[in-house]
Amino acid sequence: MLNFVILGGTMKFAKSAGIFAVILSLASMTAVWSAAAQDQHKAQIDALRKSLEKYQDYKVAVRDLYLSTVGCIHYSGEKIAGHMEYAKGAMGVHFVNLTVKGPPDPMKPNVLIYEPVGKKLKLVAVEWLVPVTPETKQAPTLFGQTFMGPMEGHEPLIPKEFVHYDLHAWLFKDNPLGMFAATNPKVNCKGYDFELLEKPTRMMHGH
């Protein structure tokens, strides 16, 4: 009887050890896949950053049909039920290219974002704005990131009827909240002639 109990315990231990080994193997494979995906995204992001360097001069952006919405947007961190949650910080001055349409192109964001620094504008981030249409089935993704939304347009700069998804990428300024966060606490709108403290945008459920 004792031998059976010991043998049974050994069998259980071996079975548990086998399951544990499988779990470790799967975890290792997942880590490898994740690292490979991150490397791929990093290569894409590095290529994107390099291709956009020319827009450090906002006049080049304007010539390429990125038009300024003038206001420097920032948020207080206020939370309102049914609205997007934006951490305290700024988004900056948006330059929108209305000629860029269709599914989000990782190498062609339709928004460039600048921070006013003294009398100049410094390129700090980019954004992809994707309007919600009857054909939209789910939130888009880029670089392994799911777009935020759907939400109304950011009044007064964008009509609230412009229901959309968006994704920011802070390619040219470090963001302690993360590269793909909507706001950046290191971006400053204070002293800018067209400083706009916005309320969080209303979420649009059911789209």
Whereabouts are the PLM-identified features?
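Intrinsic disorder/low-complexity segments in short proteins, especially the signal peptide
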Residues: 7, 29-31
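Bacterial N-terminal signal peptides that target proteins for export
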Residues: 9-21
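Bacterial N-terminal signal peptides
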Residues: 20-29
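Primary mode marks residue(s) on the alpha4-beta5-alpha5 output face of response regulator receiver
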Residues: 38-207
